[in-house]
Amino acid sequence: MDGAGESRLGGDGGGDGSVGVQIRQTRMLPDFLQSVNLKYVKLGYHYLISNLLTLCLFPLAVVISVEASQMNPDDLKQLWIHLQYNLVSIIICSAILVFGLTVYVMTRPRPVYLVDFSCYLPPDHLKAPYARFMEHSRLTGDFDDSALEFQRKILERSGLGEDTYVPEAMHYVPPRISMAAAREEAEQVMFGALDNLFANTNVKPKDIGILVVNCSLFNPTPSLSAMIVNKYKLRGNIRSYNLGGMGCSAGVIAVDLAKDMLLVHRNTYAVVVSTENITQNWYFGNKKSMLIPNCLFRVGGSAVLLSNKSRDKRRSKYRLVHVVRTHRGADDKAFRCVYQEQDDTGRTGVSLSKDLMAIAGETLKTNITTLGPLVLPISEQILFFMTLVVKKLFNGKVKPYIPDFKLAFEHFCIHAGGRAVIDELEKNLQLSPVHVEASRMTLHRFGNTSSSSIWYELAYIEAKGRMRRGNRVWQIAFGSGFKCNSAIWEALRHVKPSNNSPWEDCIDKYPVTLSY
C-alpha cells in the first residue's frame, strides 16, 4: 500500500527547544468478523457462473467416457441397430453436440501463461543504511529537528533493513534532483529487469506483441513504454500501454490488461513492467503525513513475460487463474487517503490520511468477499454463505464465518507496503508466520518497491524451493484510488528460481528475526 500505516507520529518541540515526538496509534484494519456485504458475495458467484458451461461439460465428458469404456461388442451392435432406425434423432443430437462444442470453443477462457519474471537488483553502492539515510537527510538542511526525529522513529518501526536502496541522485548532498536523473533511474530499473528476463527466456524483443508499463509518479514524454520500445527496437505494430498514477496496486492492473489483450490477440507474447520512480518524488518538507513515503519507498522494479501460446505451457512457471479488482474511488475519503499535493510551503509530496488503514481494510474485505466463491472449496463456501444468510435473518446477531483461505492457497504475496498491513492481514486472515514470511522479508531486504513488491515476494518463495506443481499463489496489492487487486496463479511445475534472482546472494540469511 502507498505507505502502509505505521504508527502516526507527530508533535513539535517544546518551549525549551527540545524535540517532542508523540506516537498516536491509527485505527488498524477492521476485523473481518464484522459485517460482509452480500452484494459482493453475489458478484463472486456471478464470476463463478460465467464459467458454468466449462464446469458442467467436463464432468459430463468424464461420465460419457466411463460408460463408453464399459461397452462390449454386443452393446455396440445394439447401438448400431438403434442408430439405423433413429436417423432423425441422430441428426438432431449431432447438431446439438456440434453446437455445444462450438459454443464451448468460442467461450472457454484461453489460458494465459507466465513464462518467467525478473526483478531488478540495484548495485551495492545504492544501499541506504539507517545512519546514512539520517545523515543525508540532516545535511540537506530541508528538515527541522522534529521532522528528522519523526523519520528516525518511522525507520525504526518500519520493518525495513539496512540493505534497501535509494536512487543515485539521493546519494549526493545536496540531492541532484533533475529530469535527467529521474530518467536515468527509470532506465536502470526497467532495462536491468528486462535484460535479465530476455536472457533467461531466450525470447527476442521483436517477438513481443504487447507491452504494458506501470509507474505511478513519473510519467515523462516520451513515455516509459516508448523508452523501452526505443531501447529494444520493438516492432512497429506493438500494442504498448503506459499506466500512471495508479499506485502500488497497478502491477495487478497491468497484468489484467495484458491478459485481456492476450485473449484477443492470438499467438503472441506480452511483457508487463512494474516500477516506481523516487528521484523526483522525494519530499523535502516537514509535514508529517508526507514524510512517511521517504522512509518506506525504495528502488525496485520487475518485468513479467506472459504468453498465450499453447506450446509455451511446458516451459512456463504459472498459469493465470483469476484477477479480481476492487475500486473505492467513488468514496471521497478513499479517493483522498493517498493524495499527491503541495504542503503550505509549496513543496510536493504524497500525503497519507489517518484513515488509510481503515479504508484499506474495507477495500480488502470487499475484494476477498468477491474472490471467495471463485477459489474456496465447496465446504468453505457453504459455511460462509449459510452464516451470511443467518446473519441477515437475525439482524447481525450472528458473526459471519470467515473462510480459511489457507485451504485455497499455499502461498501468499501480500504487498510489502509496511509492517502494519502485513501484521493485520496475518491476524485477520488467520495466517501463520510462514505464510507472510515472503512479505516480511521482502520489506526488510528491499523496502516498499511499490507495484513490483509482489514479484520480489514470489521470487523469495521460489528461492526457498517451496513452489510445487499445482500450488496456488495469491498476490494481493493495495494502491491509491483507493484500490485492492488480487491475482491468482497456479504453478505448472516444481518451480526453481531463475538465474540472477534478486535473492541469489542472500537467501541463505533469511528469514531473519525482526525486532521493532
Curated annotation (Swiss-Prot):
UniProt cross-references to InterPro entries, sorted A to Z: 3-ktacl-CoA_syn, ACP_syn_III_C, FAE1_typ3_polyketide_synth, Thiolase-like
Keyword Hydrolase on entry: no
Disulfide bridge positions per record: none
EC numbers on record: 2.3.1.199
GO CC aspect terms: membrane
Bilayer topology term: Multi-pass membrane protein
Membrane-spanning intervals of the chain: 48-68, 87-107
MF terms in GO: fatty acid elongase activity
Compartments it resides in: Membrane
Domain of life: Eukaryota
Keywords: Acyltransferase, Membrane, Transferase, Transmembrane, Transmembrane helix
Induction: Repressed by herbicides such as flufenacet and benfuresate.
Tissue-level expression: Expressed at low levels in siliques, flowers, leaves and stems.
Record domain FAE: where: 104-393
Predominant localisation class: membrane
Reactions listed under catalytic activity: a very-long-chain acyl-CoA + malonyl-CoA + H(+) = a very-long-chain 3-oxoacyl-CoA + CO2 + CoA
Pathway: Lipid metabolism; fatty acid biosynthesis
Family the entry assigns: Belongs to the thiolase-like superfamily. Chalcone/stilbene synthases family.
Protein name: 3-ketoacyl-CoA synthase 4
Organism: Arabidopsis thaliana
UniProt gene name: KCS4
